[in-house]
Curated annotation (Swiss-Prot):
SMART domains, per database record: FYVE, PH, RhoGEF
Keywords from the named record: Cell membrane, Cell projection, Cytoplasm, Cytoskeleton, Endosome, Guanine-nucleotide releasing factor, Membrane, Metal-binding, Nucleus, Phosphoprotein, Repeat, Zinc, Zinc-finger
Name by which UniProt lists this protein: FYVE, RhoGEF and PH domain-containing protein 2
Binding site for Zn(2+) 1: C464, C467, C489, C492
Annotated residues for binding of Zn(2+) 2: C481, C484, C510, C513
Entry-linked Gene3D superfamilies: Dbl homology (DH) domain, Pleckstrin-homology domain (PH domain)/Phosphotyrosine-binding domain (PTB), Zinc/RING finger domain, C3HC4 (zinc finger)
Organism: Mus musculus
Biological classification of the source: Eukaryota, Metazoa, Chordata, Craniata, Vertebrata
Residues bearing PTM Phosphothreonine: T644
Amino acid composition bias (Basic and acidic residues), ranges on this chain: 32-41
Notes concerning its domains: The FYVE-type zinc-finger is necessary for early endosome localization. Recruitment to endosomal membranes via this domain requires the presence of phosphatidylinositol 3-phosphate or other phosphatidylinositides. The PH domain is necessary for localization to the ruffle membrane. Recruitment to ruffle membrane occurs through binding of phosphoinositides by the PH domain. This domain also contributes to the lipid-binding properties of the protein.
Gene behind this protein: Fgd2
Amino acid sequence: MERACEKQDSVCNLVAVFENNRTPGEAPGSHSLEDQPHSPEHQLSLSPEPWEAPPVKEALKSEFRPVSRTYLSSLKNKLSSGAWRRSCQPGVSPGPETQEPEEKRVVRELLETEQAYVARLHLLDQVFFQELLREAGRSKAFPEDVVKLIFSNISSIYRFHAQFFLPELQRRVDDWAATPRIGDVIQKLAPFLKMYSEYVKNFERAAELLATWMDKSQPFQEVVTRIQCSEASSSLTLQHHMLEPVQRIPRYELLLKEYVQKLPAQAPDLEDAQRALDMIFSAAQHSNAAIAEMERLQGLWDVYQRLGLEDDIVDPSNTLLREGPVLKISFRRSDPMERYLVLFNNMLLYCVPRVLQVGAQFQVRTRIDVAGMKVRELTDAEFPHSFLVSGKQRTLELQARSRDEMVSWMQACQAAIDQVEKRSETFKAAVQGPQGDTQEPKPQVEELGLRAPQWVRDKMVTMCMRCQEPFNALTRRRHHCRACGYVVCAKCSDYRAELKYDSNRPNRVCLTCYTFLTGNVLPQGKEDKRRGILEKEASAAPEQSLVCSFLQLIGDKCSRSLPRSWCVIPRDDPLVLYVYAAPQDTKAHTSIPLLGYQVISGPQGDPRVFQLQQSGQQYTFKAESVELQGRWVTAIKRAASGRTPEGPDEEDVSD
């Protein structure tokens, strides 16, 4: 019967906590612990008004540093550290060895730390909070709303612990001989610990406001400093006291975990204590989630500020996945340019640094939607660690500073792509239902005009990729087809077609893409002419060649070295060596039938040099490495003897 009465009193106390919330105009001391009806053991020995002492000049000069978000997030990693728990309890020291059970010693430690914690809450709510509110109303030197933002919902937390949990815990310890259990008490506490999430989320903002107004308002600083110098504050700063509620839930979890470990296997409180531990763990996770959400929003805000707070990118629901500098490979310039990428869960922002670092740090040049984006590694000897990002809006060739950085960027992009595709598939399955179409969609073979192409770099070609006429700076300049990315001359790109990836705006396209996109018949006189013997595309050679690479042709007179050329032995014409001015040229400037040639390796004492000789004709080539020279010599010897790689005993020398 007595136990039932105790439970009824506990519920009444709990209801009173939330029915008697203080209003802004309420008297400052109307809910102090001294007014509560619990036993003398619960009374807190606080000096009545120590903060009324005259201001201390030295204390006014002290600096207050805001608690960083990094330090706040580190609290999540300390849940299992017993040493951390003990270091946070300077006023609690283990007493002499007694004969009481170990689980009771843990409960007594929980009670002692709870008493000290409620004293800190009383100091925060009834002293700091009320004194600052009174000063704000009297002097109008700082807004009352600022004070309320700094202390958040500390009043609810204080009343809950002072009027409900501490009295319940005290009664249970006093009656331990008759009721050796606390699991049921903790279970009553656990659901209300979620109120800490609001306090934790507001903590960093509160610390910033406190630091700001300590510098900005002299009356604000004087009130805080007077209280900090008092005996009740133990010479600790307000920020130190404000951190206690953030640390309290991890301490509950540590103490309760130790209590469960000390309980005997047949203890009547074991089941309730384990259930209470699970509930405390859930509350700790809830608090950690609040910290993570606060960090996410703060990180988003920092990025948005550096990008100039543009309306079309600012969205609090976004998730920042990765950001950092990269090098942009230009299709016109030989040296890559410094750029900055910001990857969100739904878009990739391609940014350029601003010349004047006033306000925004970067300017968003292109936004690429993750939906439909593709990423792959590029095999480019001139630009190592390079990768391609192809989106509907634009295709970018990028270079990282190391292979690890390149892999990290590619993995981050691919993870974002996979997540978007997974959500899309889930949505389609929900719309179609179990009776929906189960056939796998056929991949779209032709994406011409639907997504931005990869542009061929200017220096990779020396002639128009459509008409094979050589470029020059005056009469035949380079242009890019916006549909296929080929480098073409003005005559071959004098057409306009609407491209879907560019919001159906007319763009310069080549004749071939114009015909495909519009369906119009080729204009008279524009039909493709018959291919000549040298018109074998070099762009297809790396995938369809026995061997291909840059070779330097050494002249006969005075060993004069000519510019290096792109040389290919095609699979479909394995007895001929084609020499191109650039890798993407559609027409070779020289072809050498290899049948009957004699191959001499290293004629000039250089292991990278080899020579072709036949009937007074002589060609001397220099490879970029000894290994590459060996591959060329093997392939040419095979071709010179009339053998082709289709035989079963022949070896393919291509990579």
